[in-house]
Design a protein with these regions (language model features):
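Membrane-interfacial loop-to-helix junctions in multi-pass inner-membrane proteins
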Residues: 57, 139-147, 179-189
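Disulfide-stabilized, aromatic/cysteine-rich ligand-recognition loop
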Residues: 14-60, 64-71, 75-89, 93-126, ...
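Functional-site microenvironments in short loops/helix caps that host divalent-cation chemistry
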Residues: 151, 155-157, 161, 165-185, ...
């Protein structure tokens, strides 16, 4: 990023930390420094009152969240790997998310904002001091690169969460010191219709030898996928508005039993953050501003139940996660009748994301038109499968065969069964973390996250 005084450009850091080749400790430390600078940018304009915010099930108090990110880094790098004593005597009781119930985080005796910033700086300073630290965990056998990546990606996830928390709480959009892409429309030749994928057997999950992947995708395995057709673009605001106009939120036949119960309890009659003016025009809330609904921009803040209901209305369905990954990462044979054995890390190939092929890293500060960024197309012609908006799949979040929890045992296993898989990342996801095989997961009722969807033919 710009204006941080770092010796490497952000694109260089993305390449190094997403490469199949292990980044050096110095490169990982620099990435940790950049990630911490971004975390601080995301909260630097907020008051003490705003940093605590209201008690809501779907967000954390941001003063707790940034302290937790620093504590996590300290726990795994300095304490677990380095064998050092805790910096804060009471830190585990404040910041260990496995021990501290969500609802209690507003009531904790948290350090002040200034003290929290000081703690964050102290942790990072010690992490940057590479002396007197073991290069490998003698118990698990994981090397320091694993724990550096774990802390890095964990903080990046919380940076994305802080961003959608600002949207939830109607705060101004964050002030981030990097070059923005400007016009979110980014006009390009319009595309529509489906891409046909011939199906076949392929390896689901990451098998490219990356230095780090989370435990829920560490067991790549062969699966059989039947031929299918998938939309070349995500569902747009205009398409979702047509569903609303046709009574989609009132017509029981489009909703699953669980979805209808959610809709009634939430009193939902249109997508979240939408508001209709007296003249019938739709507006949507973009952080603390109301803007006209953009027809060709990807629809976001849609939960799984809403996506499923839209599909039923449209005579479509959500893709499975295997279908989504095949459409994003596989290549058709020369005659189009099968897939090859070549699997790409990203839809466009194996090179790391850039602003020319993916809307990531806050550069557009929101979703862009679904026709934009043709350089990011998959081999089958699907656009924006990386970045812009997370995409719901029909698949429940479950363990891959042979699953073994990683050192951070609470990351995946507690959430198997009642969450749904999302793929692709969003505009606030870090380029260095996302790949086609990356699995995200949320409960199907979540509308606050930057999630949309694309559809498949029945």
């Amino acid at each position: 990023m710009d204006d941080l005084g770092l010796s490497l450009r952000e694109d260089d850091l993305n390449m190094m930390t997403s490469s199949r080749y292990s980044a050096t400790t110095a490169q990982l430390i620099e990435a940790l420094q950049e990630a911490r600078a971004r975390t601080l940018e995301l909260v630097s304009d907020l008051s003490d009152e705003q940093l605590m915010g209201p008690r809501l099930r779907i967000v954390n108090p941001m003063r707790w969240e940034i302290g937790h990110a620093a504590w996590f880094q300290e726990f795994w790098i300095l304490r677990h790997l380095g064998g050092l004593a805790p910096i804060l005597a009471q830190g585990d009781g404040l910041y260990d998310s496995a021990r501290v119930a969500h609802d209690s985080r507003w009531d904790l005796p948290l350090p002040s904002t200034a003290q929290t910033f000081a703690y964050m700086n102290q942790v990072l300073d010690r992490v940057c001091d590479t002396s007197d630290r073991r290069a490998r965990d003698p118990i698990t056998g994981y090397d320091e690169s694993y724990f550096f990546h774990l802390a890095l990606f964990h903080e990046q996830m919380h940076a994305e969460a802080i961003t959608y928390t600002r949207q939830t709480l109607c705060y101004p959009r964050p002030r981030i010191g990097l070059r923005q892409t400007g016009d979110r429309r980014l006009p390009a030749e319009s595309i529509s219709g489906d891409a046909h994928v011939p199906g076949g057997r392929f390896i689901l999950g990451d098998s490219s030898g990356l230095a780090f992947v989370f435990d829920n995708e560490q067991q790549p395995h062969e699966v059989e996928v039947a031929p299918f057709s998938i939309s070349k673009t995500a569902v747009t605001n205009r398409e979702l508005a047509n569903f609303v106009a046709d009574g989609g939120y009132e017509r029981r036949e489009f909703w699953s039993d669980e979805g209808w119960e959610w809709k009634r309890n939430a009193a939902a009659d249109h997508p979240m953050y939408w508001r209709r003016e007296s003249n019938g025009r739709w507006l949507r809330r973009d952080f603390n501003e109301w803007v006209a609904l953009e027809d060709r921009v990807a629809a976001i803040h849609v939960n799984w139940y809403e996506a499923d209901a839209y599909c039923r209305w449209a005579g479509r369905r959500l893709p499975t996660e295997a279908e989504w990954e095949m459409a994003a990462s596989c290549e058709p044979s020369s005659d189009g009748g099968s897939i090859t054995n070549n699997k790409r890390r990203y839809p466009w190939g194996n090179n790391s994301p850039t602003p020319a092929n993916a809307n990531l890293d806050w550069r557009a500060m929101g979703c862009i038109e679904v026709d934009a960024l043709p350089e990011g197309d998959s081999a089958f012609g699907c656009r924006q499968m990386i970045g812009n908006s997370w995409e719901w799949t029909s698949t429940a979040f479950e363990a891959y065969p042979g699953f073994v929890p990683g050192p951070y045992k609470e990351y995946s296993a507690p959430w198997f069964g009642d969450h749904k898989v999302l793929r692709g990342g969003c505009w606030a996801t870090r380029a260095r973390m996302i790949r086609s095989a990356y699995r995200n997961f949320y409960t199907p009722d979540r509308r606050d996250v930057w999630a949309g969807f694309r559809t498949c033919a029945l």
